[in-house]
């Protein structure tokens, strides 16, 4: 690849050595490279590689081609495992001079773990990596998360690392989308944890669980990351607030991954009811980012409305699917997907 990837210097070195002499010992090559490339921190990088390989070997985890760190959060990328890997990199950093090339190389190699941990924060299910805290009754973002996100952005910038993947999704867009997600995370969402009922059927992703829409975990930039998917059909879902409640604003996010036929909906309609039978429209939000050949490959859009003097128990969201990929798309006429996450009601 022309773009940086995890430990790409090491992998290039090992492949080149083995091409010249296939009889060389694989583990010896790894140790030799790490000791020279990372200085006194090299042994901790070697230990990291050994530990993560061991964890993968000990599970039935299947690594998808277009996978996401969230798929490994119950196995080799569990919160405790990620914490252990992070500590090894921090030990490596502590063993070399701050101004040395060794330090810069270790920081650069560490961003894969930083990325996985940032995605773990989104899930908001681990005490080791909490997304938010309450401070003096005010909901705030975990300061450690903010520091890690800033460091991730800085290291990528300093090393001219511009892409998150081979599909053209940029680091700049990733950080921007993440910051937008943090803005959502600190909202006082009265729909959080409330029961969601689906009137159309989802498919395959997020275990087809409607509660994904109100579970407090934020969808990332991959459709494997906490998004509820609908293939070729609209999304119709309603949430029960348990009692008549005053509401002032509503929003929900949708994902776009154009090369995988995942598009934003045509529009999103919000409705309210007191009895689940008679629904009144609160408003319809049109897609501001119409699909075209120059659309971002990977993007997240928030559909939101503000309302006044509305008291209700049930809130419904209807998202209109494009149904099929357009004629100019490589998947022309195939069913298109919409992916939704986190209904926010304030």
Predicted segments with their positions:
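Aromatic- and carboxylate-enriched substrate-binding clefts and catalytic-loop regions
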Residues: 1-24
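Short secondary-structure boundary/capping segments
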Residues: 9-16, 267, 286-287, 298
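Catalytic domains of carbohydrate-active enzymes that cleave complex glycans
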Residues: 17-198
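Predominantly extracellular/luminal regions of secreted and cell-surface proteins
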Residues: 185-218
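Aromatic, loop-rich ligand-recognition surfaces of beta-strand-rich domains
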Residues: 218-283, 299-346
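Solvent-exposed serine/threonine-rich low-complexity stretches and specific carbohydrate-binding patches
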Residues: 282-292
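Short glycine-/Asp-/Thr-/Trp-enriched loop segments that recur within the blades
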Residues: 293-297
């Amino acid at each position: 690849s022309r773009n940086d990837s995890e430990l790409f210097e090491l992998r290039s070195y090992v492949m080149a050595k083995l091409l010249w002499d296939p009889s060389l010992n694989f583990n010896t090559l790894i140790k030799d490279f790490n000791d020279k490339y990372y200085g006194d921190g090299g042994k901790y990088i070697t230990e990291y590689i050994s530990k993560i390989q061991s964890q993968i070997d000990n599970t039935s985890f299947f690594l998808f081609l277009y996978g996401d760190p969230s798929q490994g959060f119950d196995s080799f990328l569990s919160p405790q495992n990620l914490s252990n890997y992070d500590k090894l990199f921090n030990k490596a950093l502590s063993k070399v001079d701050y101004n040395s090339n060794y330090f810069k190389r270790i920081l650069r190699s560490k961003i894969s773990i930083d990325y996985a941990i940032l995605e773990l924060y989104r899930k908001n299910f681990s005490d080791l990596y909490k997304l938010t805290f309450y401070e003096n009754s005010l909901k705030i973002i975990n300061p450690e998360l903010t520091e890690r996100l800033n460091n991730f952005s800085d290291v990528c910038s300093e090393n001219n690392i511009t892409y998150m993947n081979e599909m053209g999704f940029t680091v700049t867009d990733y950080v921007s989308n993440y910051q937008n997600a943090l803005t959502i995370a600190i909202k006082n969402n009265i729909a959080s944890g409330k029961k969601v009922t689906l009137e159309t059927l989802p498919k395959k992703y997020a275990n087809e669980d409607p509660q994904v829409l109100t579970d407090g975990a934020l969808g990332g930039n991959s459709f494997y990351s906490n998004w509820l998917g609908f293939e070729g059909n609209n999304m119709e879902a309603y949430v029960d607030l348990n009692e008549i409640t005053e509401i002032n604003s509503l929003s929900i996010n949708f994902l776009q991954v154009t090369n995988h036929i995942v598009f934003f909906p045509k529009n999103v309609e919000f409705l309210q009811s007191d009895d689940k039978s008679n629904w009144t429209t609160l408003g319809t939000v049109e897609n501001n980012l119409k699909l075209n050949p120059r659309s971002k490959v990977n993007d997240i859009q928030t559909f939101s409305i503000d309302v006044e003097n509305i008291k209700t128990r049930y809130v419904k969201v209807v998202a209109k699917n494009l149904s099929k990929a357009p004629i100019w798309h490589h998947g022309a006429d195939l069913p298109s997907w919409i992916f939704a996450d986190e209904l926010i009601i304030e």
